[in-house]
């Protein structure tokens, strides 16, 4: 006769595995533990640097801020790297820094506030931004001399709150943002009805067509995008949308989550601005509908680069 053995008691290592795993220290690769030398040894060489960043950043400020990071892990060295790489003299004033997320502007306020003041002048941190997108308030600008004005363009960047900005966002964030943008842009109608072109799936024929229309250029990736990290995983989740008239264009996941542009030949800047105001409102309205039915937070007017 076979006798059944009593069931073995579960080993304690298995029984309490889930508790032990919670008590284990975090893997070194997961925690933010930057191995750095002293501030003097890590401070960049700014002797001939002409950027605004170089005029603001001091060794004392670097000592105070270099160990800080936003919750997503963006550091002061990440912020200043584009300016460190862009050290040669330029006739154009270059800011020389980027923000990795909205929190960058508060965590590194000691750096950003004087930098914004240097670039824009009369900047006051406690002053609220007031937007005036009523084209009726624009006086004149309907017939600028076309001997001097070939093209008029109005452009702005928009980012979705709680997503990292392009210098720091992950592949998953970028893909979620592209999906959000496509849903909103494809819902536009009237003069804003148009087509989204994914750069990843762009055929040679489509590339030539968009280049001929002035929407694409040969050098889509700028030095700033390379040094800041904006070009990571290019062209994954990047694309451009344009209306049928090709005078209202939206870039997705380039320098900002969205870069919205109204453009046309000639000197009627008021017409361009009117289209920009109306189109921007429509895009944001459609985005808010997508946000309402999805899990996306609200839009912000902060941008990744000043």
PLM regions and their residue ranges:
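Long, Pro/Ser/Thr-rich low-complexity/intrinsically disordered regulatory tracts in eukaryotic proteins
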Residues: 2-305
């Amino acid at each position: 006769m076979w006798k059944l053995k009593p069931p073995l008691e579960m080993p304690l290592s298995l029984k309490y595995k889930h508790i032990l795993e919670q008590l284990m220290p975090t893997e070194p690769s997961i925690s933010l533990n930057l191995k750095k030398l002293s501030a003097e040894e890590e401070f960049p060489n700014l002797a001939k640097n002409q950027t605004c960043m170089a005029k603001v950043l001091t060794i004392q400020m670097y000592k105070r801020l270099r160990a800080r990071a936003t919750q997503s892990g963006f550091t002061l060295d990440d912020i200043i790297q584009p300016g460190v790489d862009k050290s040669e003299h330029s006739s154009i004033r270059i800011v020389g820094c980027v923000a990795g997320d909205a929190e960058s502007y508060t965590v590194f306020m000691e750096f950003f506030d004087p930098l914004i003041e240097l670039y824009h002048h009369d900047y006051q941190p406690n002053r609220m931004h007031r937007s005036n997108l009523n084209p009726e308030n624009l006086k004149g600008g309907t017939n600028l001399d076309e001997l001097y004005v070939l093209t008029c363009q109005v452009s702005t960047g928009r980012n979705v709150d709680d997503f990292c900005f392009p210098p720091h966002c992950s592949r998953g964030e970028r893909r979620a943002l592209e999906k959000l943008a496509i849903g909103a842009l494809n819902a536009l109608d009237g003069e804003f009805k148009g087509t989204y072109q994914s750069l990843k799936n762009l055929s040679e024929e489509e590339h030539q067509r968009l280049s001929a229309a002035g929407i694409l250029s040969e050098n889509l990736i700028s030095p700033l995008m390379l040094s800041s990290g904006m070009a990571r995983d290019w062209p994954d989740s990047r694309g451009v949308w344009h209306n049928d008239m090709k005078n209202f264009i939206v870039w997705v996941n380039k320098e900002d989550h969205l870069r919205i542009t109204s453009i046309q030949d000639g000197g009627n800047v008021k017409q361009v601005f009117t289209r920009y105001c109306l189109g921007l409102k429509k895009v944001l309205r459609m985005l808010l509908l997508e946000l309402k039915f999805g899990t996306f937070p609200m839009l912000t007017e902060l941008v990744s680069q000043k």
